[in-house]
Structure formats: structure tokens, C-alpha cells
Amino acid sequence: SGDRRFDLAALYYGLQLQLVVYMNAAMEMEARRHPDKEIVPAAMLYYHVTDPMVESQVELSPQEINEQILEQLRMNGVVCGEEDIIQRLDREMGDKSTVIPVEKKKDGSYSARSSVMSSQELGLVSAYVSHKVRQIGQEILGGHKEVNPYEKGSNEACTYCAYKKVCGFDPGIPGYRRRLLKELDRQEAFESMEEELGDEHRIYAGSTEGH
């Protein structure tokens, strides 16, 4: 129900795994149903459940009102950048989709406002989240339960924590520190994932190609 935004750096740090966990589960189910086929993810998207309101200083036509409503309801997340997949997700798309976070420039390439990944990048994200979930599970089973909140830019784990009043964390007491998480751009996040996973999933690090 919240207006959630996909954050690749937050995913790398293990703070935003749920959407990819769901995608992986769906892919595993489809792989069991269709063992003779390659399962390719098309997208992983958030849909904000809301009742949009249109405000305007000028009178709008019914079509203009509908376009603004669709704009507010457009899903966000990540879409596979293969053209046939995008056409299946939004068959009526022109230069800008009202359904998925994809826009095209005049030359047909995706604009900077688009949220697309290649199938290789989606595969890397999928493998990394599976690795991260196993890692976190092993830490839980190993008894790791330290009070160790993060700070990433202006975001702090304690801000909306339901247990803030009982956990006892106080940065004013010596020994209590937040984990300071570095901001990562898209390529840095992908390369950091590759470093943890090893050569099998390497599509960025060591490459001279720009992304």
C-alpha cells in the first residue's frame, strides 16, 4: 500500500529483498511447470494501491484527466529491456508507457527515466538475492542478533522501527554505532554483487564496456 521505490543499492545491502524473492519464487514455480523451457523474468514491479486525485488550475478534458490518473497509477520497479517483452507488458505503448516505468527517446533508445535491465542484469540480481537470503538465514541460525542499525544517506533504520523504545540502542553511549552504508550508483551496485558471487556471474567487473 506504500509508495515503494526500487533501490538497487538498498537491495545490495540486504534492505530491499522482498520483490526479488517473490520473482525468484515465481520463476521456480514456472520452471517446475515447464521443465523443457527457459524461464525469463519480464519485470518485477510495485503497484501503489491508491485512489488518485487530479488537481489542475485549468479545466481538463475527460481524456486528460484519465491520462493523469494513469500516470499516478503507473507501476514502478524494473522491466526487462527486451523489446518483445516490453510490447507484451504494454501493447499500446507509444513513446511513454502508462503502465510500466519505460520511456523512449526519439531514436528509440530508453530515456534516463526508464527503469530497465538486461536479462543478464536481472539474472545477476536474482542470483545475488538468493545468495543474500541464504547468508542472512545462516547468520540467524548462528545466533547473530546484534543491535546494528544502518544509516544510508538521509535514511536511518531507527526512524520507523517499531522496537525503538525497547531495543536500547543509543548512539550517545560509547560502543553504539550505526552501520554507515555508502551510496552506490547502478554500475557500482552490480559490480559489488559480482564480487560477492564470483566469476560465474560476472558481466561488469573487468569489462572495458561502459554502462
Task: Give the residues covered by each predicted segment.
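Structural signature of nuclease core domains in nucleic-acid processing machines
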Residues: S1-H211
